[in-house]
Every structure is written in C-alpha cells, then in structure tokens.
Amino acid sequence: MNLLVLSRNPQLYSTSRLVLAARSRGHTVTVADPLEFRIVIAKGLPAMFLNDAPIGRTDLVLPRIGASITNYGLAVVRQFDMMGVPVLNNAVAIARSRDKLRAMQLLTKKQIDVPITVCARTPESVELSLKLVGGTPAIVKLQQGTQGIGTMIAETPQAVTSLLEALWAMGQDIVLQEYISEARGADLRAIVVGGRVVAAMRRQARAGEFRSNLHRGGSSQRVDLDKRYAQAAVAAAKVMGLEVAGVDLLEGKSGPKILEINSSPGLEGIERATSVDVAGAIIAHAERLLLRRTRRKNRKDEVIEGERRTTRMRESLIPIPVAGGKRVNLVRGA
C-alpha cells in the first residue's frame, strides 16, 4: 500500500508512529504538509500537485489536519475524495467533529447524552442561558478548538457575562456548557478505530486546573471501559462518520456524557498510558478498508463485464419472421 499521511510536522510523535507502524507492515509511506498541495479543479479531471509536481500513486490518505489549517486541509482531503482515493477520515466527518455545536446537535439527535449546552449571541440571553446549564460554575467554549485551547471555566454569573461579551466582541462563536461536578476534573479518552474501542485512559487534571488534557499538564492511567461507555464512544464516532476518533467522555451520575470528539487524536498519551499499539491498529484498519474497497470494485467490474457480454449476445441475434407472426432468433454468422 502507498500511504500518504497529511501532517505539517513529520517529527510529531503521532505522525512518526503512524509512519513506523505502516513501514513495519511493508507499506510505502509519504508524509506531506497539506499546505504544500496545489488543487486543480476542472470538469472531469480533478488533480493535485505537491511541490509543483503531480502526486504519485496513492492508495490511501490518512489526514492529520491541525485546527489552524482546517479550511485548506479539508479542501485537500475533499480533492483526494473527488479523485477516488480512499481517505481515513473524510472531510465531512472531520468538519462535523471540529464544530462543537454541530457535533452536539448530531449526537443528541441520535439520543446520545452530552452536557447541557447552550448557544447564544446577545448579552440579554446570558441570564437565561446560565439558568439552562444549571448556574455556575459553567464552562465556556469556543466552537472550534483542540487540546483544551478555548475552554474556560467561569465561577460566577458576572464572570460568565464578562467572558461571553469579550468573546462576542472578538467575533467568536461560543457555547455555554454545564459543569459536571461529579467528574472531579477527570474524563475518559477512548480511541475508536473501525467501530471498536482499541484503547482507553482516564485523564485527571492537575491541581488548580479543571481541564484534564495532557497538553494542559494532566495525568493519565489505563482504564477498561465498561460496556455503556464503550458503546457510547463507538456510537459517537459513528454519528460523526469517523473511522478513527478520540472520544472524550465524562462520568456523570446518569452514565456517560460525550464531551468532545477528535478526528486527529494524539497518540503519545494514550500509547504511553495503555501500552497499546494504537498506531498499528489504525494502519491495520486502513488495510482492511482498502481491501474492502478493492473487493467492491472488483465485484462492480465483474457486474459491468457481465452486462457487456449480455448486450453483445443480444446484438448478435437476428430476428427472422416466420408464419403465424412468430419470430426466430438466429445467431449472426451461423
């Protein structure tokens, strides 16, 4: 398999682990910065150039699109899809998961539990919004953000109002979310690959910090998810349409609550906490995905060829009228 990994930095742990896992299984791997691609849009001829040269044979694309380049990165991913190249994850799924509000809307439509979330844009709406999420403390989030960036806690109604007004003045779209006190600064991160949880860990925020992200100094330990939590993680990834996902869950009084879904989950923390070869699991799923696609294509080609043979056979018959208005078909050249 010729695998293309879209990543701005080949030295990142997650990128280098995916490259190592793929090469150890005999695959050829190229790492390319999404911003270095040139997209050619033409009727019937979508194309891509990398560093001003046409891209070579690519069997599958594995995107690692950072939040800072979401728009152009998704355009590159969509172009590969238009060219018929399999992508693990596709642009629509990535875009869904990046928009926190959209993700919550889709999850609740499928009856998947999430923290109570409110979106508003006027100062007059703050008081009601705060009541809807259960008062303070409350969580204020930018609609797009990763690794805990853009996630804040407001301890008082005045702090909520000040935060919201400041963010709105900067043109930011935000959501207000209930604070799940029983989680005690901890959450669960489950890595879902191909519809199953391959690894999971519990993350605990450091003292004085409410965000449990490892990039924010949190600690982690391996955990075996019970059935309800594993099912919730798998269902959340499925709703987004993600083949590979990092699903963050809170342990609420009533059970799992989906906090966030990441289309490019970091591998360092989860692999070190669990000793699970997550990168290998992702590459193995890419192999299965490509194999299924190849088999479907072969079956489709067989059907098309069978239809062509049938058409040729029908065209080779000559209708001959006989007495009584009946016809007899004779094979041409017989």
What spans do the regions from the language model cover?
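Protein kinase-like catalytic core scaffold
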Residues: 138, 198-199, 245, 257-260
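ATP-binding N-terminal substructure of ATP-dependent carboxylate-amine bond-forming enzymes
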Residues: 1-88, 92-93, 332
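A short linear hydrophobic-aromatic micro-motif
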Residues: 116, 137-140, 174-178, 244-247
